[in-house]
Amino acid sequence: MSTSTKRCYYETLEVERDADESKLKSSFRKLAMKFHPDRNPGDDTSEVKFKEINEAYEVLKDKDKRAAYDRFGHAAFEQGGPGGGAGFGAGFASSFSDIFEDLFGMAGQRGRGGRERGADLRYNMEITLEEAFGGKTAQIEIPVSVTCEACSGIGAKAGTKPKTCSTCGGAGRVRQSQGFFTLERTCPGCQGRGQMIEDACPSCSGQGRVTRERTLSVNIPQGVEDGTRIRLAGEGEAGVRGGPPGDLYIFLSLAQHQFFQRDGADLHCRVPISMVTAALGGEFEVPTIEKGKAKVKVPAGTQSNRRFRIASKGMPVLRSRQTGDMYVQVVVETPQNLTKKQQELLAEFEKLSSGNTQPESEGFFTKVKDFFGSRAN
């Protein structure tokens, strides 16, 4: 491209002429990510734009080159020009490599020899409230990828070894130079592994791992809650070609309980009581989560939905010595299917009742009477 058709380097990087180093680098990163060939496969326009961006940044990030460009323009870098002869050599390649390994992860997740960390696995487990209270050790069976014993995870047939890729020299990546521009890509020969397996292991088809059923012991501590996650390090899928294994994550869910509702470390339950017990007072027993019993004393005149607290009868707090409380909510039942004698007794009780025995009802009807009386006036 001749100097007469080249765009201004500042326009190419979309910055002002007085832009400082941080603004240059920020704009360069943004544009480079946008037009990088790996993100725009087959787009020749993006590749040309990407080269222009790198050329502009290579000049403007260097104080001496920038000063020469500001004075002479593109002519400063033509052969025989005021600043010619330097070209874009190793300095550009180094800058490109440093920046784009950071931007696009060119260092990769693979180690030398194509070793890759195994995938993490998830296992969903439902437990009861009683199990969450006391803790338990559970046995689970899961299908996982394990290291192939036939090839010891290498992927090559027994008696053979992988060979270093001749294309990349075992690096897993290759560099392609186009004049001043150097682009680093995944090696097409070994697909980034750095090694070539000419005779694959028949047991694992060269993957270095096979699928097996594995039985694991899972320790569930006291006080776990719905959604608690337990990590078993190294119990995920085996790594590829000798890479480290992934982890296994156990996600716990609590089954609905027939009697208790849980709120953090506290437990709640509803217990029906008779109208007589509510009026005269009494005592009853309720089951506790540890399979015991607790007594609840009901004072005379107890109203429906009143709650009673039983200290330290709730759930243990995970990884703590603290324990929640248990709350018992009483529900006063209205009697049904009364005999004639029972109906007569209740009717007699109603005649004998006064504002002292039913203060809320008396107060309510007094308010209603006052309301309609005020409207009549």
Curated annotation (Swiss-Prot):
Residues 8-73 form the J domain. SUPFAM superfamilies: Chaperone J-domain, DnaJ/Hsp40 cysteine-rich domain, HSP40/DnaJ peptide-binding domain. Binds 2 Zn(2+) ions per monomer. InterPro entries: DnaJ, DnaJ_C, DnaJ_domain, DnaJ_domain_CS, HSP40/DnaJ_pept-bd, HSP_DnaJ_Cys-rich_dom, HSP_DnaJ_Cys-rich_dom_sf, J_dom_sf. Its cofactor is Zn(2+). It comes from the Bacteria. GO terms for biological process: chaperone cofactor-dependent protein refolding; DNA replication; protein refolding; response to heat. Zn(2+) 1 binds at C148, C151, C201, C204. Its main location: cytoplasm. CXXCXGXG motif repeats lie at residues 148-155, 165-172, 187-194, 201-208. It is found in: Cytoplasm. Keywords: Chaperone, Cytoplasm, DNA replication, Metal-binding, Repeat, Stress response, Zinc, Zinc-finger. Zn(2+) 2 binds at C165, C168, C187, C190. GO terms for cellular component: cytoplasm. One of its GO terms (molecular function) is heat shock protein binding. A zinc finger (CR-type) spans 135-213. Participates actively in the response to hyperosmotic and heat shock by preventing the aggregation of stress-denatured proteins and by disaggregating proteins, also in an autonomous, DnaK-independent fashion. Unfolded proteins bind initially to DnaJ; upon interaction with the DnaJ-bound protein, DnaK hydrolyzes its bound ATP, resulting in the formation of a stable complex. GrpE releases ADP from DnaK; ATP binding to DnaK triggers the release of the substrate protein, thus completing the reaction cycle. The J domain is necessary and sufficient to stimulate DnaK ATPase activity. Zinc center 1 plays an important role in the autonomous, DnaK-independent chaperone activity of DnaJ. Zinc center 2 is essential for interaction with DnaK and for DnaJ activity. Belongs to the DnaJ family. Homodimer. This is Chaperone protein DnaJ. It comes from Bradyrhizobium diazoefficiens (strain JCM 10833 / BCRC 13528 / IAM 13628 / NBRC 14792 / USDA 110). The gene is dnaJ.
